[in-house]
Amino acid sequence: MPPSFPSLPLPEAVAATAHAALLALAALLLLLRAARALASRCASCLKAPRRRGGPAVVVGDGAGGALAAATAGAWHRAVLASCAYALLSQVAVLSYEVAVAGSRVSARALLLPAVQAVSWAALLALALQARAVGWARFPALVRLWWVVSFALCVVIAYDDSRRLIGQGARAVDYAHMVANFASVPALGFLCLVGVMGSTGLELEFTEDGNGLHEPLLLGRQRREAEEELGCLRVTPYADAGILSLATLSWLSPLLSVGAQRPLELADIPLLAHKDRAKSCYKAMSAHYERQRLEYPGREPSLTWAILKSFWREAAVNGTFAAVNTIVSYVGPYLISYFVDYLSGNIAFPHEGYILASIFFVAKLLETLTARQWYLGVDIMGIHVKSGLTAMVYRKGLRLSNASRQSHTSGEIVNYMAVDVQRVGDYAWYFHDIWMLPLQIILALAILYKNVGIAMVSTLVATVLSIAASVPVAKLQEHYQDKLMASKDERMRKTSECLKNMRILKLQAWEDRYRLQLEEMRNVECRWLRWALYSQAAVTFVFWSSPIFVAVITFGTCILLGGQLTAGGVLSALATFRILQEPLRNFPDLISMMAQTRVSLDRLSHFLQQEELPDDATINVPQSSTDKAVDIKDGAFSWNPYTLTPTLSDIHLSVVRGMRVAVCGVIGSGKSSLLSSILGEIPKLCGHVRISGTAAYVPQTAWIQSGNIEENILFGSQMDRQRYKRVIAACCLKKDLELLQYGDQTVIGDRGINLSGGQKQRVQLARALYQDADIYLLDDPFSAVDAHTGSELFKEYILTALATKTVIYVTHQVEFLPAADLILVLKDGHITQAGKYDDLLQAGTDFNALVSAHKEAIETMDIFEDSDSDTVSSIPNKRLTPSISNIDNLKNKMCENGQPSNTRGIKEKKKKEERKKKRTVQEEERERGKVSSKVYLSYMGEAYKGTLIPLIILAQTMFQVLQIASNWWMAWANPQTEGDAPKTDSVVLLVVYMSLAFGSSLFVFMRSLLVATFGLAAAQKLFIKMLRCVFRAPMSFFDTTPSGRILNRVSVDQSVVDLDIAFRLGGFASTTIQLLGIVAVMSKVTWQVLILIVPMAVACMWMQRYYIASSRELTRILSVQKSPVIHLFSESIAGAATIRGFGQEKRFMKRNLYLLDCFARPLFSSLAAIEWLCLRMELLSTFVFAFCMAILVSFPPGTIEPSMAGLAVTYGLNLNARMSRWILSFCKLENRIISVERIYQYCRLPSEAPLIIENCRPPSSWPQNGNIELIDLKVRYKDDLPLVLHGVSCMFPGGKKIGIVGRTGSGKSTLIQALFRLIEPTGGKIIIDNIDISAIGLHDLRSRLSIIPQDPTLFEGTIRMNLDPLEECTDQEIWEALEKCQLGEVIRSKEEKLDSPVLENGDNWSVGQRQLIALGRALLKQAKILVLDEATASVDTATDNLIQKIIRSEFKDCTVCTIAHRIPTVIDSDLVLVLSDGKIAEFDTPQRLLEDKSSMFIQLVSEYSTRSSCI
């Protein structure tokens, strides 16, 4: 008792002393601050020159800028009101004492209220100052003051209650007691404020300030550069002090920002250097490679590499885990002593208080160590995942062709998304291997004290429980493996469908492929069902094991003649409850070990795959040779084990500065020759020497998602002058003027919203900008029109690359004369090599190629030389419409406001008139609280929510029976060893078994119901999302990267499959368990309710405070996952290009950056969970300590010892259950975001109906194939300009229509409108008198046929690619193959029609893929056929062959041909010339060629003369 207040009760004396001390400390700090400010001002006055006017006063908190405004919210006003309320209550007490006692008032009565009144006046003043100064958080002294005040208030209230009950009304001062009780709510709120620290002020700073309210908006390059330079702050975790680490307060600034506004990625601090992906990758890769070098004949161990890299982290985590395990058994060990104390068996003075203190310290240590342990394993998991992901990515860039063919891109993505995740998650189970034996030893030691030698039976029962769980775990592992295999298959097919959605829609195949995916999902669901039901069995084993162990232990003790006491039984039950966790974890541990081993084996197998050999090509210094490329005795094969190599007897010497052209028929090995120079194709013999750097342009354009400038620069620094020269050389200037944002326009996934010619020219620009020594160009001019091709060849090959070594593959014969050397390939051999004239004289293969080209040119010459009287004599020329018909068509066009033979009007759009709309949309992300509609919708997905009440009922029954079984054991056993038992031992065990096993059955029922509910909801959501995605318009796929969609159907769907339902059930479970714990504790000590209510309020507030940040972190996490997946799939697809440019390091760096962007919110999210749990458990620990203090303060005999022991037993779990309750809701809120994201895709806009039942066309439609365009207007978006401007014309049925025009003139848009991939803004398209907008999309597209520019093959077989709908016989398929000249090739293969087609058709040449696409059209036999640049990638001879097949097989069909090769359309019945989205000309080729000013004749002239011009 303090000497200055001898007459005061102890709690009031302590309160007065504490308030006085805090007042003195505050005064001292204010004086020191004033003195320091005065000294600083004096020093500045002495140093600084005098200025006019007074000193500038900046009010702020020193955050880097002046405070502009501080707005007080409800929180801050509540703080002020609470302080004022506390002050007024003390003033009221003083007034009452003076009024009642008058002059007889004692100093004792006035001392405490007077000191408290002064204290609250000071606190109110400090709270008011917060707004003036601009505090975001209250000072530490103020917060401590509030917490201490609340604690003292509760202690005084308890002391007053005890004295009132024990000694009567005279023992207390009513005025003080009433004021104290009345202050509890206000002080409880201030205590909460003290814990949280926030002032509740909305601060706004000037632009020099910290900008709390504006997110940091940085472009990708700027943000990356700033992060590399360290401009963004590094996480405070990196250099936090011990106290900050222990309390996790280093995270508070981020959570404070999140409580004020939604977090953005820029708000999240950077990871410390040691935590970044680069550091983790270097460490793991170094240890892995060291094993490879030290033990060359043995496969390196990935497990060992991980352990060697992170053993220090594992050791620190193990220390925390060991301390946590030991202190967690202190409570069960002391329960029996505590029950003995309450029974009156006091061993030493103050035993009760000492026991209560030990309980408190143990729980405190348990809380602190648990949070450090869990955060430590989370961080270790992030390190492992980052390092492994980087290793998988690096391997994906270096795979040889054979290895690449054995792993699809979907499988490689799955290695990263699934296997790496699983290995990283094993960090949670890593320490369980040695902790389980430690926990069993500690448990046996406690049981030996309570039940003696019977603890041996406990060990036997524990071993049996573990043994019983092993088969269930193995079964679960089996189901998990099957589930993962089926998921891999579904994801592979989903990825393929998403990448090729355009062809699926054009061919009306989307329903077929969607049904295939649904069938795959059904297989996956079968294994998912068994996996979930096996999880229910594991749950039953989990709850049954401690009951089984308890029955065996107690039964053995009774049989051996031992006596059970209430304290011993409660101690044993508490021990069994702790032992329950490792027993439950053991099956999970076995399962996770098995799953992790499988994942490690898969990853290790992948990392051991063959890479491209470093010696495939030999780099020779330029100073030592004049040869840029030198191949001698070369033999190469994509399949090293085949008897027939792809290329053989290759001898090639290319002198530096030469232009080498490579030509040949399709499948002759042209692209393979370039691959041999790059080192991409396995070398069987010979050598390849390269001198200088290389740039590679593949035949199939590879474009990254990003803007055009980034694609051209490709990691190089911007040189504006060189950049402009590149743009001009690649004929991109006009395209950039027309594109939105110019070269800053973000292009879609794989450049999907660029035309084929634009993609090819962007590729060429990328290569040219690199300023390489050797240029390898694989048919780069096939996708552009004649004029652009001529310009490209002159500006690019002949001018920009005049001094470079160029090897170009081409099918355009007109580009061959400019070559210094021409290589003619056939069947993998160089059959001829030489200059153009020499090869012409030699004849053979080269002569055949040139002859085919000359025939096409001669066809155009015939048209130019003929007149109207000789039209009918043109070879292969179909009968053209009569002159009157043509005139009618002209008149119809004129009536619609368009002349038939006018030049296109150049419409130059000014930059200031462009609407700044990006073509790739940012990923949709909700902000703020998850809507309750999401929860309700999800719960209503399965059986309309009827299972929810049953789940709650089963959980309630489980909790009631659990409490009843423990209460029965505490009540029926004697208090001490000398007392007689209240019931027979057999009855004791039978009743206990009945209650306990009954509770286990109810929890088993609950698990089954949750699994059934979750499975039904997951399946319904998946089907709904899948159908909405497949029904989405093509514009959605044009503007959404496939990786983003894959993220939803893989990651988010997995969360819904395996997590959401159990999170929902877990929240209901913890809620009911928490209510049970509170009920038991309050039954014994009702006073605990005094703290339970404010504690619950504090917990709810902290949960809301936390979830505001956690929710946004989870959303950011989901968004940041997509770029990682997308870069994986994108890089794997373009690995050859990346390697060809020598850009592996840059892409690896990009991958590491994206991994850090993903790890930043993940680290903060995991730390936020521990931050919340720590505070929840600390509150629970203080409540438990308060309960213990009440129990030991009651006189002996007041409370029944067994019931008090039961309350303590449950109280030991209070902190864990309280934190788990809040945490379960928070995790549910975070996981439900996956449901929210799936619902976003369930609300995607849909295309028009596939079938309109009341408006279906006849089965024979279209009979004639007439196509009439009436004032057709098309734009891609409502806010974008028109692409087609009122096009009106008619394509007569059965005629051949050629559609030509410059790049960007609207040719492909017209075709998209015909197939309704884009719905017209205005006008109509009439086919055989039916408006196509009035019928279903499936009815339309299934009656049309198209051979697209980019031939698409699906993984599977030739049969499946030709006839995916399984509508044709084998005979019909063979006939189609023979017609498209592939019959011999397919018959030569062992599998015939079942010959495999790899992902993207990589094992077939581009020309062969195009012929397969022709085979599809032959089988479909549609009346209308569209060729969209269908022959752009084949040689002239093959082009002529295809045209011959089309003329013979589609002679009665309407054929619309878009082509850049003029001979392809020169023999058409009509030619439509488009310019800037309008009809420039539409007439017969002969008439157009007669008009010397026509645009068509210019195109013809350009094509026929460009070879001579070159």
UniProtKB/Swiss-Prot annotation:
Looking up PROSITE patterns in the UniProt record yields: ABC_TM1F, ABC_TRANSPORTER_1, ABC_TRANSPORTER_2
- Binding-site list for ATP: 664-671, 1301-1308
Q: Which gene encodes it?
A: MRP4
Reported phenotype of the disruption mutant: Strong reduction in seed phytic acid, and strong increase of inorganic phosphate and myo-inositol levels in seeds.
Which InterPro entries does the protein's record reference?
AAA+_ATPase, ABC1_TM_dom, ABC1_TM_sf, ABC_transporter-like_ATP-bd, ABC_transporter-like_CS, ABC_transporter_C-like, ABCC_6TM_D1, ABCC_6TM_D2
Q: Which SUPFAM superfamilies match?
A: ABC transporter transmembrane region, P-loop containing nucleoside triphosphate hydrolases
GO MF terms here are: ABC-type transporter activity; ATP binding; ATP hydrolysis activity; ATPase-coupled transmembrane transporter activity
Which GO BP terms apply? transmembrane transport
- Which chain regions cross the lipid bilayer? 12-32, 55-75, 78-98, 109-129, 138-158, 177-197, 319-339, 342-362, 373-393, 427-447, 453-473, 540-560, 945-965, 985-1005, 1060-1082, 1086-1108, 1154-1174, 1179-1199
What UniProt keywords apply to this chain's record, in alphabetical order?
ATP-binding, Membrane, Nucleotide-binding, Repeat, Translocase, Transmembrane, Transmembrane helix, Transport
Q: Cellular location of this protein?
A: Membrane
Q: What is this protein called?
A: ABC transporter C family MRP4
Indicate, by first and last residue, each region the UniProt record lists as having compositional bias (Basic residues): 906-918
**Membrane topology reported for the UniProt record:** Multi-pass membrane protein
Q: Where is this region: Disordered?
A: 889-925
Q: What does this protein do?
A: ABC transporter that may affect phytic acid transport and compartmentalization. May function directly or indirectly in removing phytic acid from the cytosol or in vesicle trafficking. Required for phytic acid accumulation in developing seeds. Phytic acid is the primary storage form of phosphorus in cereal grains and other plant seeds.
